[in-house]
Amino acid sequence: NAAFGGSALNANTTGSGNVGIGYQALDDNTTADYNTSVGFQSMMNTTTGWYNAALGKYALKANTTGQYNAAFGANSLSSNTTAGSNTGLGFNTLVKNTTGSYNTAAGQGALYYNTTGTYNTASGNAALRLNTTGSYNTGTGNRALDANTEGGNNTAVGHYAGGLNTTGDANVFIGYQAGYNSSYATSDNKLVIANSNTTSPLVDGDFDAATLTVNGALTA
């Protein structure tokens, strides 16, 4: 073990292969192995969770038994307690996550409010920011699926794509501001391909009804 900073690895008993750098880094670690914690109070409450990596002030601060987490950026995964296999890359990523596992957030504020949602992927500033319990969502782009809270199985690619969806499930939004209007806030099983927040996208589909509308001419 290597400890640098006041109270770093302070409570360690049998844990091995740990690195704590910074005031109270890995302070409560007792038996956990192979954790790396760099930053003020990073992984401060970890006791038996192992194979975690934290870089930044308060990163993984509340983690106790969670394993295989990676938090890079101030406040990243700071509320995580027992959840595992999460990756937070950037300032304020996955801040409110407690027990949600297998989430990946890259970009400032991505998946900020996620608590118990699982298997979400957010790439971009504030992508899936308001998600709390929704699972199996993928948001790529600035504020993609930003307002989603409980909706699941959604895919959004593009700036503000699906940005007003809140509880809708199994939607696909592709393009700049695709589906970024209130008519899609709670919709399910929609396909929207557009380059604006129009209610008449170039391609408008419904997976459940197996229908597809093309708002334009099809040419060979």
Describe the residue ranges of each PLM region.
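Glycine- and small/polar-enriched repetitive beta-structure motifs of secreted/surface proteins
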Residues: 1-219
